[in-house]
Protein backbone atom coordinates (compact mmCIF):
# COMPACT_ATOMS: atom_id res chain seq x y z
CA UNK A 1 0.00 0.00 0.00
CA UNK A 2 1.14 3.55 -0.73
CA UNK A 3 0.54 6.60 1.43
CA UNK A 4 -0.71 9.72 -0.34
CA UNK A 5 -1.11 13.33 0.72
CA UNK A 6 -4.33 15.06 -0.32
CA UNK A 7 -2.43 16.79 -3.13
CA UNK A 8 -1.02 13.47 -4.34
CA UNK A 9 -4.45 11.87 -4.11
CA UNK A 10 -5.89 14.77 -6.09
CA UNK A 11 -3.40 14.01 -8.88
CA UNK A 12 -4.81 10.48 -9.13
CA UNK A 13 -8.07 12.10 -10.25
CA UNK A 14 -6.61 14.25 -13.02
CA UNK A 15 -8.48 12.40 -15.77
CA UNK A 16 -10.78 14.73 -17.70
CA UNK A 17 -13.91 12.83 -16.67
CA UNK A 18 -13.39 13.69 -12.99
CA UNK A 19 -13.06 17.38 -13.79
CA UNK A 20 -16.28 17.23 -15.80
CA UNK A 21 -18.08 15.48 -12.95
CA UNK A 22 -16.79 18.13 -10.55
CA UNK A 23 -18.06 20.99 -12.72
CA UNK A 24 -21.44 19.34 -13.20
CA UNK A 25 -21.89 18.60 -9.50
CA UNK A 26 -21.03 22.17 -8.54
CA UNK A 27 -23.42 23.56 -11.16
CA UNK A 28 -26.23 21.44 -9.68
CA UNK A 29 -25.24 22.21 -6.10
CA UNK A 30 -24.78 18.50 -5.31
CA UNK A 31 -22.14 16.78 -3.19
CA UNK A 32 -20.36 14.13 -5.23
CA UNK A 33 -17.88 11.42 -4.20
CA UNK A 34 -15.98 8.55 -5.80
CA UNK A 35 -16.46 5.60 -3.46
CA UNK A 36 -15.52 1.97 -2.98
CA UNK A 37 -13.14 -0.17 -4.95
CA UNK A 38 -11.74 2.55 -7.19
CA UNK A 39 -10.48 4.50 -4.17
CA UNK A 40 -9.26 1.35 -2.41
CA UNK A 41 -7.30 0.23 -5.46
CA UNK A 42 -5.54 3.59 -5.80
CA UNK A 43 -3.92 2.98 -2.41
CA UNK A 44 -3.19 -0.66 -3.27
CA UNK A 45 -1.76 0.34 -6.66
CA UNK A 46 -4.11 -2.06 -8.39
CA UNK A 47 -5.71 -1.30 -11.76
CA UNK A 48 -9.41 -0.55 -11.49
CA UNK A 49 -11.96 0.31 -14.16
CA UNK A 50 -15.00 0.41 -11.88
CA UNK A 51 -15.74 4.06 -11.07
CA UNK A 52 -18.66 4.39 -8.66
CA UNK A 53 -19.91 7.86 -7.77
CA UNK A 54 -22.27 8.63 -4.89
CA UNK A 55 -24.32 11.80 -5.19
CA UNK A 56 -26.01 13.36 -2.17
CA UNK A 57 -29.18 13.86 -4.17
CA UNK A 58 -30.26 12.26 -7.44
CA UNK A 59 -27.69 10.12 -9.20
CA UNK A 60 -29.93 10.04 -12.27
CA UNK A 61 -30.14 13.83 -12.42
CA UNK A 62 -26.38 14.02 -12.08
CA UNK A 63 -25.77 11.51 -14.89
CA UNK A 64 -28.19 13.25 -17.24
CA UNK A 65 -26.56 16.63 -16.62
CA UNK A 66 -23.08 15.16 -17.08
CA UNK A 67 -24.14 13.58 -20.37
CA UNK A 68 -25.26 16.97 -21.68
CA UNK A 69 -22.05 18.56 -20.41
CA UNK A 70 -19.88 15.98 -22.18
CA UNK A 71 -21.75 16.26 -25.47
CA UNK A 72 -22.13 13.82 -28.36
CA UNK A 73 -19.44 11.40 -27.22
CA UNK A 74 -21.34 10.49 -24.07
CA UNK A 75 -23.84 7.66 -23.71
CA UNK A 76 -26.18 7.77 -20.71
CA UNK A 77 -28.15 4.75 -19.49
CA UNK A 78 -30.79 5.20 -16.80
CA UNK A 79 -32.02 2.48 -14.44
CA UNK A 80 -34.87 4.29 -12.76
CA UNK A 81 -36.16 1.25 -10.86
CA UNK A 82 -32.83 1.13 -9.02
CA UNK A 83 -32.20 4.88 -8.87
CA UNK A 84 -28.90 4.46 -10.72
CA UNK A 85 -27.37 5.59 -14.00
CA UNK A 86 -24.29 4.91 -16.09
CA UNK A 87 -22.30 7.30 -18.25
CA UNK A 88 -19.92 5.95 -20.89
CA UNK A 89 -17.43 8.39 -22.35
CA UNK A 90 -14.35 7.62 -24.44
CA UNK A 91 -13.86 4.16 -23.01
CA UNK A 92 -14.60 5.14 -19.42
CA UNK A 93 -17.69 3.96 -17.53
CA UNK A 94 -18.99 5.76 -14.46
CA UNK A 95 -21.85 4.48 -12.31
CA UNK A 96 -23.95 7.06 -10.44
CA UNK A 97 -26.23 6.45 -7.47
CA UNK A 98 -27.86 8.71 -4.94
CA UNK A 99 -26.61 8.41 -1.37
CA UNK A 100 -28.94 6.10 0.51
CA UNK A 101 -29.55 4.18 3.68
CA UNK A 102 -30.86 0.63 3.67
CA UNK A 103 -32.66 -1.73 6.00
CA UNK A 104 -33.44 -5.40 5.47
CA UNK A 105 -36.05 -7.93 6.50
CA UNK A 106 -34.51 -11.12 7.85
CA UNK A 107 -35.85 -13.41 5.11
CA UNK A 108 -34.88 -11.22 2.15
CA UNK A 109 -31.86 -9.61 0.52
CA UNK A 110 -34.07 -6.90 -1.00
CA UNK A 111 -33.44 -3.73 1.00
CA UNK A 112 -35.83 -1.01 2.02
CA UNK A 113 -34.10 2.05 0.55
CA UNK A 114 -34.35 5.68 1.65
CA UNK A 115 -32.51 8.81 0.57
CA UNK A 116 -29.52 9.45 2.79
CA UNK A 117 -26.27 11.28 3.41
CA UNK A 118 -22.72 10.25 2.55
CA UNK A 119 -22.44 8.95 6.11
CA UNK A 120 -25.55 6.79 5.61
CA UNK A 121 -24.11 5.45 2.37
CA UNK A 122 -20.76 4.60 3.93
CA UNK A 123 -22.52 2.88 6.85
CA UNK A 124 -24.17 0.43 4.45
CA UNK A 125 -20.88 -0.59 2.80
CA UNK A 126 -19.66 -4.14 3.28
CA UNK A 127 -16.11 -3.51 4.56
CA UNK A 128 -14.08 -0.57 5.83
CA UNK A 129 -11.69 -0.77 2.89
CA UNK A 130 -14.66 -0.35 0.54
CA UNK A 131 -16.16 2.57 2.47
CA UNK A 132 -13.47 5.05 1.42
CA UNK A 133 -14.70 8.13 -0.44
CA UNK A 134 -12.99 10.99 -2.26
CA UNK A 135 -14.81 14.28 -2.81
CA UNK A 136 -15.03 15.63 -6.37
CA UNK A 137 -16.53 19.05 -5.61
CA UNK A 138 -14.10 21.86 -6.45
CA UNK A 139 -13.84 23.24 -2.90
CA UNK A 140 -12.86 19.83 -1.49
CA UNK A 141 -11.50 18.08 -4.57
CA UNK A 142 -9.32 15.12 -3.60
CA UNK A 143 -10.35 15.14 0.06
CA UNK A 144 -10.48 11.62 1.53
CA UNK A 145 -13.44 10.70 3.75
CA UNK A 146 -12.54 7.66 5.87
CA UNK A 147 -14.87 7.38 8.90
CA UNK A 148 -14.07 3.74 9.72
CA UNK A 149 -10.29 3.60 9.50
CA UNK A 150 -10.22 1.92 6.11
CA UNK A 151 -6.77 3.30 5.29
CA UNK A 152 -5.35 1.80 8.46
CA UNK A 153 -7.01 -1.53 7.62
CA UNK A 154 -5.35 -1.41 4.19
CA UNK A 155 -2.01 -0.87 5.94
CA UNK A 156 -2.68 -3.74 8.35
CA UNK A 157 -4.15 -5.94 5.58
CA UNK A 158 -7.35 -6.56 7.53
CA UNK A 159 -10.91 -7.24 6.33
CA UNK A 160 -13.37 -5.66 8.76
CA UNK A 161 -16.97 -4.46 8.61
CA UNK A 162 -17.80 -0.79 9.23
CA UNK A 163 -20.69 -1.65 11.56
CA UNK A 164 -21.38 -4.61 13.86
CA UNK A 165 -20.59 -7.58 11.59
CA UNK A 166 -23.71 -9.42 12.78
CA UNK A 167 -25.77 -6.60 11.28
CA UNK A 168 -23.68 -6.39 8.11
CA UNK A 169 -23.85 -10.14 7.42
CA UNK A 170 -27.44 -10.66 8.51
CA UNK A 171 -28.62 -7.80 6.30
CA UNK A 172 -26.87 -9.21 3.23
CA UNK A 173 -25.44 -12.73 3.67
CA UNK A 174 -23.63 -12.56 0.33
CA UNK A 175 -21.18 -10.27 2.12
CA UNK A 176 -19.84 -13.33 3.94
CA UNK A 177 -18.65 -14.77 0.65
CA UNK A 178 -17.35 -11.37 -0.40
CA UNK A 179 -15.39 -11.30 2.85
CA UNK A 180 -13.72 -14.58 1.92
CA UNK A 181 -13.17 -13.37 -1.65
CA UNK A 182 -11.43 -10.15 -0.63
CA UNK A 183 -9.26 -12.05 1.85
CA UNK A 184 -8.10 -14.39 -0.91
CA UNK A 185 -7.82 -11.82 -3.69
CA UNK A 186 -5.88 -9.32 -1.61
CA UNK A 187 -4.07 -11.73 0.70
CA UNK A 188 -5.65 -10.02 3.72
CA UNK A 189 -6.54 -11.39 7.15
CA UNK A 190 -10.15 -11.50 8.34
CA UNK A 191 -10.58 -9.55 11.58
CA UNK A 192 -11.39 -11.78 14.58
CA UNK A 193 -14.82 -10.25 15.31
CA UNK A 194 -15.70 -10.33 11.63
CA UNK A 195 -14.66 -13.96 11.29
CA UNK A 196 -16.57 -15.04 14.40
CA UNK A 197 -19.66 -13.30 13.06
CA UNK A 198 -19.23 -15.07 9.73
CA UNK A 199 -19.28 -18.37 11.61
CA UNK A 200 -22.41 -17.39 13.55
CA UNK A 201 -24.34 -16.18 10.53
CA UNK A 202 -23.27 -18.61 7.82
CA UNK A 203 -26.64 -20.39 7.72
CA UNK A 204 -28.07 -17.14 6.32
CA UNK A 205 -26.32 -17.94 3.03
CA UNK A 206 -29.33 -20.12 2.21
CA UNK A 207 -31.41 -17.08 1.20
CA UNK A 208 -28.92 -16.19 -1.54
CA UNK A 209 -29.61 -17.35 -5.10
CA UNK A 210 -27.44 -20.17 -6.43
CA UNK A 211 -26.30 -17.94 -9.29
CA UNK A 212 -24.92 -15.29 -6.94
CA UNK A 213 -23.22 -17.96 -4.83
CA UNK A 214 -21.65 -19.53 -7.91
CA UNK A 215 -20.32 -16.17 -9.09
CA UNK A 216 -18.62 -15.44 -5.76
CA UNK A 217 -17.37 -19.00 -5.42
CA UNK A 218 -15.67 -18.85 -8.81
CA UNK A 219 -13.91 -15.64 -7.81
CA UNK A 220 -12.76 -17.20 -4.53
CA UNK A 221 -11.34 -20.34 -6.11
CA UNK A 222 -9.55 -18.37 -8.83
CA UNK A 223 -7.94 -16.03 -6.30
CA UNK A 224 -4.13 -16.33 -6.00
CA UNK A 225 -4.12 -16.61 -2.20
CA UNK A 226 -6.93 -19.19 -2.01
CA UNK A 227 -4.75 -22.05 -0.74
CA UNK A 228 -2.56 -19.89 1.48
CA UNK A 229 -5.00 -17.79 3.50
CA UNK A 230 -5.26 -19.33 6.97
CA UNK A 231 -8.73 -18.01 7.65
CA UNK A 232 -10.03 -19.43 4.39
CA UNK A 233 -8.29 -22.71 5.21
CA UNK A 234 -10.33 -22.82 8.40
CA UNK A 235 -13.52 -22.39 6.42
CA UNK A 236 -12.49 -25.23 4.09
CA UNK A 237 -12.23 -27.52 7.12
CA UNK A 238 -15.67 -28.97 8.07
CA UNK A 239 -14.37 -29.56 11.60
CA UNK A 240 -13.85 -25.83 12.08
CA UNK A 241 -16.31 -23.46 13.71
CA UNK A 242 -18.13 -23.01 10.40
CA UNK A 243 -21.18 -25.31 10.11
CA UNK A 244 -21.03 -27.99 7.40
CA UNK A 245 -23.76 -26.28 5.39
CA UNK A 246 -21.46 -23.34 4.71
CA UNK A 247 -18.57 -25.63 3.81
CA UNK A 248 -20.76 -27.63 1.47
CA UNK A 249 -22.24 -24.49 -0.01
CA UNK A 250 -18.78 -23.12 -0.75
CA UNK A 251 -16.80 -26.18 -1.72
CA UNK A 252 -19.18 -28.84 -3.10
CA UNK A 253 -21.38 -26.45 -5.05
CA UNK A 254 -22.68 -27.95 -8.31
What are these regions (language model features)?
Residues 248-250:
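Leucine-biased recognition of intrinsically disordered, low-complexity hydrophobic segments
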Residues 241-246:
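Short, intrinsically disordered low-complexity segments enriched in Ser/Thr with adjacent Pro
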Residues 1-239, 252-254:
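Catalytic cores of the polymerase beta-like nucleotidyltransferase superfamily
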Amino acid sequence: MIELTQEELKQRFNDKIFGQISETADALGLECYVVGGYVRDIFLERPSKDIDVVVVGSGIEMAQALGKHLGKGAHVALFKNFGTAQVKYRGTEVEFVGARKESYQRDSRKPIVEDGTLEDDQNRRDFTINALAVCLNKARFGELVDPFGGINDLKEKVIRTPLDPDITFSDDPLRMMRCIRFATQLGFYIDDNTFESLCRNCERIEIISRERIADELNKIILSPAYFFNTRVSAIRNPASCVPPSMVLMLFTYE
